[in-house]
Amino acid sequence: METALTKTPEKRQVIFLAILLLLWEASSEAISYSMPEETESGYLVANLAQDLGLRVGELTTRGARIHHNGNKELLQLDAERGNLLLKEKPDREALCGATEPCVLHFQIILENPVQFFQTDLQFTDINDHFPEFPDTEMLLKIQEIAQPGTVFPLKAAQDPDIGSNAVQNYTVSPNLHFHVVTLSRSDDRKYPELVLDRALDREEQPELTLILTALDGGAPPKSGTTTVRIEVVDINDNAPQFLQSLYAVEVPENSPLNALVVTVSARDLDAGIHGNVAYSLFQGGGGPQPFVIDEITGEIRLKGALDFEATSYYTMEIVATDSGGLSGKCTVAIQVLDVNDNAPKLTISSLTSSIPENAPEAVVAVFSVSDPDSGDNGRMVCSIQNGLPFLLKPTFKNFYTLVTERPLDRESNAEYNITITVSDLGTPRLTTQHTITVQVSDINDNAPAFTQTSYTLFVHENNSPALHIGTISATDSDSGSNGLIIYSLLPPHDQQLGLASLISINSDNGQLFALRALDYEALQAFEFHVGATDRGSPALSSEALVRVVVLDDNDNAPFVLYPLQNASAPCTELLPRAAEPGYLITKVVAVDRDSGQNAWLSFQLLKATEPGLFSVWAHNGEVRTTRLLSERDAPKHRLLLLVKDNGEPLRSASVMLQVLVVDGFSQPYLPLPEVALNPTQEEDMLTLYLVIALASVSSLFLLSVLLFVGVKLCKKAREASLADCSIPEGHFPSHLVDVSGAGTLSQSYHYEVCLTEDSGTSDFKFMNPIIPSSLLQDS
């Protein structure tokens, strides 16, 4: 991703063009200060808080700091008092050389919000340097025939000071032949020329010695001197002349040492030794020059490395002197060409290494870029990788702010490595990269999420207490305490469930435990909700449904409903002697409280006095005859029936049945009972049974009447008041209800018990069947 004035397919780039800088500078006024150089450290430059219109404490709270743009750090900020202090003594000449004015540019950076203030500090020059000549002695060879008014150039003195503190005047010691004049170059530097006032006579005075003095304009002025020794030579009437008065050349700054810069050429019309010309580097502007000249050929070559960023332009004077002392001069102007030899520099001013997720636009870093090259070599493009939720914003004058483009999500990416790439536009391009690591700090923005919306757990009944029946699990993509989950049981919708006595949960890992043994016959299944809550602030939670299904174990034996079993005597059924094969004697009705295959019942005839006469249907418990009865068959038979389920382990119940063979229902043949009972005791038992039966029938009848009346009253009340009326519904186990309405016996008999005072054997009297005999035979 890139922020740019122009976009490429690869990157969005931000290009600071000159026009953008000009527009910014036009709209931003810098705060300027001025002070003389060589001021002692600790000097109070200004009260910065007052000048910026800020409260004193605001500089500290907003993290105020100074950005020096790569310059020497001469200033320090007392943020508590708001004072801008001098850190060390400044030397204008070391800072700016001959550049005027000497201005130190720096920025004041504030955070929360980010603000920039351009500030300039100008150092004024003081006269702290003496003029100094490059040589302690200068030698001039002047022919004795030189005419008055002839001018002889002299080497200028150097003074690092500028303006009026630089060299302003030259004087020469009193003499009869010469005076000195002070002239100015195009850069306003002063240089001396020696003017002949009176003709020389070698024979009279072959050599003269003068003292040349250079004076600056300080108060008081400072001076420097050198000795000018003049040798008077014989006549030489032609001075050397250069072919060009000005040589202008361009040299790339990366030229190697000893590279040829330019060749100057001068000629002398004299013959012989007076026509021989020697070249010398006579005058350079402002200090040592990285050039050397061959005195014979006039070739000017590099003797030191060039640096466009340090000095981009050189001017020097070349003197051609013949053996007679006559000379000529020319000017060589050398323009150093910039090459792209400096990679951009990136300076981090402010860096935030941790950003909270879901935060709006946040400042990650503030940095500046610089490139001392010129032109396209110094123009820069700043970019970051594509696909990152960050933007580069140009804030001011080569400053960028790295901000978040949108709220971050720590769960998607907890760390970003942002590579800032700064490239110049030179050929070839030079690039600097800097990587910033940003950590995304977590906030509690994710609720725990269960791995399933609902859980179904299976547990066998009769389990041991504290049995682990299953585990629910939730995850939270937050970190730290925001991602720690606490599990809990939520209050059930059915308050009668008693969940707290059935189930417990481990709050740390979500394991569920059955607190007590479960009974399938009492509770086949139940549901409840579990909650998962994190430890964030505020805490977030979610819930899931848990359904516990109790699996049936074969823990109940079949229970025989009919015939009723008596511990003292088995149930007695009657069999007509004329019964056809397949005659239904009775039907064994049994139930099993278990479910599934544990409740699948089968019937079996275990033992009979006449095994070939009777059979039991395995699936419905019907006891039938298998053949016709004969006279040889006994009048009484005992049958032992077995009712068993299909569970594991198999459980069963036995039924003892006594069958009496009778010739007819009106005159049954009843043998004496095997055990003689006390008649009084038998009468008491029969009476008790009759009372119980009568009470049961009466209760059922009364209950039915009450229920019928209640239903009618509820219907009338609902119709009258248009209000809801709920009728309680009884719960009857499905395996105890005869859905077909046919019952378990296919024949209905009416029994009448006849008790007489002289009935010693308490015989039963059987009435005719309620159902016609023809129907019985059809069945």
From Swiss-Prot:
Forms homodimers in trans (molecules expressed by two different cells). Forms promiscuous heterodimers in cis (at the plasma membrane of the same cell) with other protocadherins. PROSITE patterns: CADHERIN_1, CADHERIN_2. Calcium-dependent cell-adhesion protein involved in cells self-recognition and non-self discrimination. Thereby, it is involved in the establishment and maintenance of specific neuronal connections in the brain. This is Protocadherin beta-8. Cadherin 1 to cadherin 4 domains mediate homophilic trans-interaction, the interaction with an identical protocadherin expressed by a neighboring cell. This is a head-to-tail interaction, the cadherin 1 domain interacting with the cadherin 4 domain and the cadherin 2 domain interacting the cadherin 3 domain of the other protocadherin. The cadherin 6 domain mediates promiscuous interactions with protocadherins on the same cell membrane. Each cadherin domain binds three calcium ions. Gene3D superfamilies: Cadherins (2.60.40.60). One of its GO terms (cellular component) is plasma membrane. The keyword Ribonucleoprotein does not apply.
